[in-house]
Amino acid sequence: MTKNDFTIPAILMISLLTLAPLANAGCCSEGTWDPSGFLNSDAGTGMPSQPIQSAQAEGSQESAAVSSSSPQNPPDRLASYPNGIIMKPMKSVSSSDVIIDASNGDGYAASHIKNAIHIPSKDLLDGNGNIKGDVELSRLLGEAGLSREDSVVVYGSAESSGEAQLAFLVLRHLGQEDVMLLDGSLDDWKAAGLPVEAQETIIPAAEYIPTARPGVIAEYDYVKSGQARIVDVRPFVDFGKGRIPASTALDPANVIKGDKIKNGGDLGTVFSRLDKDMPIVVYSDDYSQSALVAYSLQLMGYEAAVYSWGDWQAHEGKGDDTDSKYVKLGKT
């Protein structure tokens, strides 16, 4: 065998060894073509490429994280509440929901969420500012087209107004299982590019059959019994003149930041001195204010009901002016 006889096979062998990695890169173990295998190989070496985390890539990820939590893309604040299921994100509202605009005044006629019906929160109260009876409330809701089986979303002129919270609590009291407060106002809805209209929405009347739920609207005997922690949300000057014995004062402004209910972390500070193992009754001479605080307590997992200062006066007179304590519950 000549020298050239050895040279040619050697050259062929070297060529095959060089091409083998590229062949394997495009094949799976059974010998069929695998595009991902080829794409994941390094064309220069035939070795699988390794992901390299560059400083620039890390910076891009950090920028994305900052962007996602920016004011334009706020994180889901509902997760900050232990009982956030009673608040509904705007983007989760669907055509199957009955939307109630509980705002007072003439704002509804100017603009409202598309297909929202108008039930002003003041219509839930009688001439003395007390919550109407169950029969009258059921008639009002039925005439508006609502049934107890509906999925309901309520909003008001602003979260700070207490309008939607009062409607929410009245519906819960009547046994409405699926009712939530909208996480945002009409202005927030518009800013999100969601549909609005000025035309009044009218839906066919329905039969509203209530099933009264205890523990939402408190009664005198329960408040008198001492089974609940009593929170007074009237102006402090009124608290000083007379109050329910052993009550604690709380300014409703402490649960609001801007025109929204504070997030769970801040509310936790506000309510830090309240025991979750004890029911709470929130009272005022303005149900929108007591409802605002009671709803905020419910968001944080407390069992909270509303009560009327007027009802207490009807039974007890002006109330005690000594056996009470003023506590500023966590201004944040």
Q: What is each PLM-predicted segment?
A:
Residues T2-A10:
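Bacterial N-terminal signal peptides that target proteins for export
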Residues A23-T332:
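Cytosolic catalytic domains that perform sulfur/thiol-centered chemistry
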